[in-house]
């Protein structure tokens, strides 16, 4: 499935920047296909790796995706503080857990969970190796980036670098930022 949609990208590292049209489009795309795969089932605990400001939680709720808890994994404490404020009702209900640390160090429970990583370029693939076999996993990456840990300049590179036992969706979406056009890739399946 290929989607060719152009959206301007101007995403500063701020809470407002995390809601720019390109990022909203990417997260909405993710939620639409995740919801389709879940088909009314609960996602269990959802681990959001590199959670940034935590707004993935907003999109998951807007899409009415059923989950037990959101576990936000982030290396910057101030971003987790913002995520807590943004998702305060979930926090008060005990459905939001904030983890200060690296995705590559997470120890996952021995039960059904969902793992989402929309920053796969920015982490070594150790995070992926640690995800338990059979886990519902959602990965987004992009081409045309420099100084990243994982280069995915083609759809084939992206697909090969994150092998899933059962891929239920994979596609790409064209975006545009001030300097260049680029492609965001997404893969959903069971590791």
Positions of PLM-derived features:
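Short SAM/SAH-binding signature in class I
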Residues: 110-120
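Conserved SAM-binding motif I beta-strand of class I
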Residues: 68-74
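C-terminal substrate-binding/active-site "lid" region of AdoMet-derived donor-dependent transferases
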Residues: 123-190
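Conserved SAM-binding loop of SAM-dependent methyltransferases across substrates and taxa
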Residues: 53-66
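Short acidic, S/G/P-rich loop/turn micro-motifs used as interaction or catalytic elements
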Residues: 53-56, 76-78, 103-106, 119-124, ...
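Conserved class I S-adenosyl-L-methionine
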Residues: 41-54
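S-adenosyl-L-methionine
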Residues: 1-41, 75-112
